[in-house]
Amino acid sequence: MEGQQPNREDRLLQEYLRTVKEHSCGLLSKIKMKKCFYFLSVAIFFSIEAIGTSAAIPHRIVIPDIDGYKTLKGELHIHTVFSDASVWPTTRIDEAMTEGLDFIAITDHVDARLLKQKNKGLMDFDRNESYKIAASAGKSHNVLIIHGGEISRGMPPGHFNTLFVSDCETIGKASDAHEDHYKAMKAGLAEARKQGGFLVWNHPHWERQAQNETRWYPEHTALYDAGMMHGIEIYNAFCGYSPEAHRWAMERGLTLICGTDSHVPMFLSVDFIKGDIRPVTLVFARERSLGGIREALDARRTAVFANGMVYGREEVLRPLMKALFEVSDVKYAEKKVTFRVVNRSSIPLTLRKAPGSEKIVYPRDMVIRPFEEVILTVYGLDNKKPIGLDEFDVNFAVMNFLIDVESPMTYSLHFE
């Protein structure tokens, strides 16, 4: 309405647009924009309409529910313009919805030194602003929004995410009160724990903080013993998979976590044209709700799906394999058995013949692509003769399902 005062979100967006315009040589004035845009880091950003057909539509991630639990797909580490990224919070919601995610945690840095727009005097906001904006948009887009933030310090102890908190302002101030990295982290995590937070050690293998080796320091033992480490990021899009973090998670009972840690629009970091998928944390929850996600994180019912690999505990990966690996149309003949296999997910399946099937012949190595349907044939050792077995097992090592470091899960089909 004419003369109506802009609300807080509109005012902040206008401040940021004005800032970007001043630093972009007038390019923004040539681009017609709405409220939810993709921002390029130095000032050029496009609305969905402006991108048009030049950008590929992201592939929606499809993964079936498992027995007794809903399979929720989400992002637990991502940034916006309210710390040091170039993306508006509502754009993160648009991305999540388009890619088929169920939840995201916007984890902007809570450290005062990393609130770049505020420090330059360009925008005025508190450290909960990105969550407030995202939570409002999430309701209309059916995306669950977890209130989170990232405490970023030198190594040790490094960076930690605080998830399911209520006030990032007090967490940031508690950390900012100390110059020593460990004392600052401990103070921030103590405040987050007081708020009921779920605490995650981020990217322990990030080369800027782990130049030559990935180490578990005495400071991490102290935080772990104090109940200030509940999960660990075993995959981060900046630095990939960490076998060390995976091993620590299994040894110490930490929840397996994944994050893109993205500071730019997703279409700049994920090649959707090639069909790539952003790394996600899979949460096996009793219900699709924030409470359901939190209960599953506490119970360690998670897996990481990244770069074609799935990392998780066997108690969730085995039912996941059962849910997505559909077998039907079994036909018995004297010399062979044929059956149809359908991959009901966005996860490729890399299969290798495993011990226990030495008396039958079937492909030793194969890949079943997402949603692909294949016919498999099993013969006896001499395909010109009857199989000669009353019953047998077709055993696979699922090479891209790791239930521990370098430990593929085995999966069997029984025929009789």
Language-model features, listed with the residues they occupy:
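Aromatic-lined carbohydrate-recognition surfaces of secreted/lumenal glycan-active proteins
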Residues: 200-212
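Intrinsic-disorder-associated, low-complexity terminal segments enriched in Asp/Asn/His/Tyr and depleted
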Residues: 7-10, 16, 23
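Charged catalytic cores and adjacent phosphate/nucleic-acid-binding surfaces used
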Residues: 7-8, 54-75, 93, 157-166, ...
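Bacterial N-terminal signal peptides
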Residues: 41-49
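Short, Lys/Arg-enriched N-terminal segments with co-localized hydrophobic residues
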Residues: 28-32
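A metal-dependent hydrolase metal-coordination microenvironment
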Residues: 58-202, 219, 234-248
